[in-house]
């Protein structure tokens, strides 16, 4: 199985006439088709809503595309709340899931009418002291501890995670929140990251559904929603079988009917926060080969670096690479594909089998639509690249310009004795 880019060499050659490489490119048609598929997969649940994890791809043009499908925003910081507000999201279309949260962020989330998802038991008093009340609708994050497993083995270790409340804390939190005026409750949990299996959401849903039945019976709280959070992953490697959201939705539906409906809780809404699944496959980093080096290994130097995509350098993550125009050429050369940072980990690929790469070739680094641009940084004085939307009509639209040296030095503009010029 091979990955096929959503953009052709001919299209890139036209785009670079206006916008030089490197740049992050997004596929509007793919984003829209996937958003509709998610809605269709959970259409059986009238209250369903996907809250896109803004941290994954914080671009207003992309958020507004998702808004067309009545999706919300999952925010975890003041600036993400600002971005959501500026795109027209408000009230219960914003989920504020934060941890170690400053008071001003709780206050701003409350001002916007966002649903606040409390990460810790001690945040109850902190929130009340900060905003002067407990919201009528409130959510709490649950951490079951231990190890979360599926049929294909260990998936993750919640017991080693800093997030969420224990079961005992969760039950006590609901009782206290109810006594302080909360009327509608939600439960949130995130137990594994980037799962490439259709089992994850159904298994998580089963655990949370059984939990909220117990919560309602013991506390009398009105459970309004169960938030399955994120964790539904994408197939970064060509030999992986992608998740099927329709199968996942049907699996959640099955356990919903088995657990919640018999308990008289058939009106509970399902929420999700799928940043990676919503965007990763529909973005790529386009870069150009500018150097080759032949020492103990064969190196191809490109004009992008880890500052544009940090996942391979920091996490050792695999991102597939296509050499545009050579999709059908034999992969008979072994390269390290590297950037220009003064760090030896600045490598997009190590010992990767690729077609012969010539200087000036354009490379597509796949699946960067989530946690790609958003995790960029300025180490080594490198500047963040542009973001471009490949619109459904085939036109390329600039949706964020590339940084300039003036942007890099902008935070010195308050000092009269510091002037940095070429």
Language-model features, listed with the residues they occupy:
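Structured core elements
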Residues: 72, 95, 115-117, 139-141, ...
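Active-site loop/helix belt of alpha/beta enzymes
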Residues: 144-291, 354
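Charged (often Lys/Glu-rich) extended helix/loop segments that serve as interaction or gating elements
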Residues: 260, 265-422
């Amino acid at each position: 199985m091979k990955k096929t880019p959503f953009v052709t060499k001919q299209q890139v050659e036209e785009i670079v006439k206006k916008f030089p490489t490197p740049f992050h490119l997004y596929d509007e048609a793919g984003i829209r088709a996937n958003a509709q598929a998610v809605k269709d997969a959970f259409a059986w649940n009238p209250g369903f809503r996907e809250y896109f994890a803004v941290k994954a791809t914080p671009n207003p043009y992309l958020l507004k595309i998702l808004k067309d499908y009545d999706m919300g925003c999952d925010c975890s910081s003041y600036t993400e709340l600002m971005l959501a507000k500026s795109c027209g999201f408000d009230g219960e279309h914003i989920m504020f899931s934060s941890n170690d949260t400053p008071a001003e962020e709780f206050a701003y989330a409350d001002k916007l009418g966002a649903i606040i998802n409390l990460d810790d038991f001690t945040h109850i008093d902190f929130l009340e002291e900060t905003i002067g009340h407990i919201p009528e609708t409130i959510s709490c994050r649950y951490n079951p501890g231990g190890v979360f497993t599926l049929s294909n083995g260990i998936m993750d270790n919640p017991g080693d995670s800093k997030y969420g409340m224990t079961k005992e804390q969760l039950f006590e939190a609901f009782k206290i929140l109810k006594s302080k005026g909360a009327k509608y409750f939600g439960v949130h949990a995130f137990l594994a990251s980037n799962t490439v299996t259709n089992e994850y959401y159904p298994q998580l849903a089963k655990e949370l559904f059984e939990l909220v039945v117990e919560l309602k019976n013991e506390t009398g709280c009105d459970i309004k929603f169960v938030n399955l959070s994120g964790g539904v992953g994408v197939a970064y490697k060509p030999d992986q079988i992608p998740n099927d959201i329709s199968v996942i939705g049907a699996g959640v539906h099955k356990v919903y009917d088995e657990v919640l409906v018999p308990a008289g809780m058939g009106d509970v809404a399902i929420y999700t926060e799928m940043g990676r699944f919503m965007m990763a496959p529909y973005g790529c980093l386009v870069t150009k080969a500018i150097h080759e080096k032949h020492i103990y290994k064969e190196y191809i130097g490109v004009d992008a670096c880890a500052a544009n995509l940090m996942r391979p350098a920091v996490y050792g993550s695999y991102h597939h690479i296509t050499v545009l125009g050579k999709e059908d050429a034999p992969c008979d050369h072994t390269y390290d594909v590297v950037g220009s940072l003064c760090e030896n980990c600045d490598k997009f690929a190590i010992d990767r089998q690729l077609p012969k790469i010539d200087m000036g070739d354009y490379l597509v680094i796949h699946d960067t639509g989530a946690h790609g641009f958003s995790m960029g940084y300025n180490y080594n004085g490198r500047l963040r690249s542009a973001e471009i939307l490949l619109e459904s009509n085939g036109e390329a639209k600039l949706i964020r310009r590339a940084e300039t040296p003036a942007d890099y030095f902008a935070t010195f503009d308050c000092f009269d004795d510091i002037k940095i010029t070429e």
